[in-house]
Amino acid sequence: MVKLDPSSLGLAIFGCAIGMALAALGCGIGQGLGLKGACEGIARNPEASGKIQVALILGLAFIESLAIYALVINLIILFANPFV
């Protein structure tokens, strides 16, 4: 196993923390805007709430998958040492 020097490991950890924070921030904003739009749509047209709900859940799943991809990439950077 090849070891990283402490400064490279620290920078990798810092980069992963910043990357995950930005991914969580973006996903949170996206989910909030999607929920806001769905609530406004249901308030305007209550009869279409079923279709709006299905589209909302599908959209939220796609948004959440971005955070999961960011987590996987961060775990690869932390534990697989791709820089060596």
From Swiss-Prot:
Pfam families per the UniProt record, alphabetical: ATP-synt_C
Membrane protein topology class: Multi-pass membrane protein
PROSITE patterns listed in its UniProt record: ATPASE_C
Keyword Transcription belongs to the record: no
Reversibly protonated during proton transport (site feature) positions: E64
Cell compartments where the protein resides: Cell membrane
Predominant localisation class: membrane
UniProt record similarity statement: Belongs to the ATPase C chain family.
Protein name: ATP synthase subunit c
Species the sequence originates in: Lawsonia intracellularis (strain PHE/MN1-00)
Native organism taxonomy: Bacteria, Pseudomonadati, Thermodesulfobacteriota, Desulfovibrionia, Desulfovibrionales
The encoding gene: atpE
